[in-house]
Design a protein with these regions (language model features):
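Well-ordered beta-sheet/strand-loop patches within structured domains
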Residues: 2-172
């Protein structure tokens, strides 16, 4: 979904009209909350349309492990207009205590992280418009909820207890 998120951010900055977008179920590490877009099966998709009177062209290029999207077209927005997108966290949900799953294949007392926990979040994305550096507009684009998830560890069997050694008492 990093591909979809990258395209979404290009579409936002070009100020194209987003007609469908869903967030990931949990926060992702490569963008701030509410700056993401997910695709999955037939139930999550990213759709947008050209709301300008002139054609646009969006090019995607891959070089090594880097994907770049570039939007081309005639910029019909007023000169001096800039936009900024601000992620605002409205609340968080603690993931709770980690889950421990017994794994007899591990050494006694061993503990191996299977998955990291995620803090749940509620966030929104603001679009802020500036004309010659002066804020002229601000709107909420969307509000999103991200699930919390507990960390999961596999744990080996309990370490065997060592019997206590008692010293014989001295004769009295």
């Amino acid at each position: 979904c990093q591909l979809c998120t990258t395209l979404y951010n290009v579409v936002l900055r070009a100020e194209l009209e987003v007609t469908q977008r869903q967030n990931h179920s949990m926060t992702v590490g490569y963008v701030k909350p509410s700056e993401d877009a997910a695709i999955a099966g037939t139930y999550k998709d990213l759709k947008f349309k050209n709301n300008y009177d002139t054609p646009i062209y969006i090019e995607g290029l891959v070089s090594g492990n880097t994907l770049t999207f570039t939007a081309y077209g005639k910029d019909t927005r007023p000169e001096g207009r800039t936009v900024e997108f601000i992620s605002e966290t409205l609340g968080t949900t603690d993931p709770g205590a980690p889950v421990e799953k017994q794994d007899a294949s591990l050494a006694p007392g061993a503990r191996v992280k299977e998955s990291s926990g995620h803090v749940g979040k509620k966030s929104r994305l603001w679009k802020v418009v500036y004309e010659n550096g002066v804020e002229t507009g601000r709107e909420i684009l969307h509000t999103d909820s991200y699930m919390a998830s507990k960390a999961v560890y596999r744990v080996g069997p309990a370490a065997p207890s060592v019997p206590a050694v008692t010293e014989p008492s001295a004769p009295s």
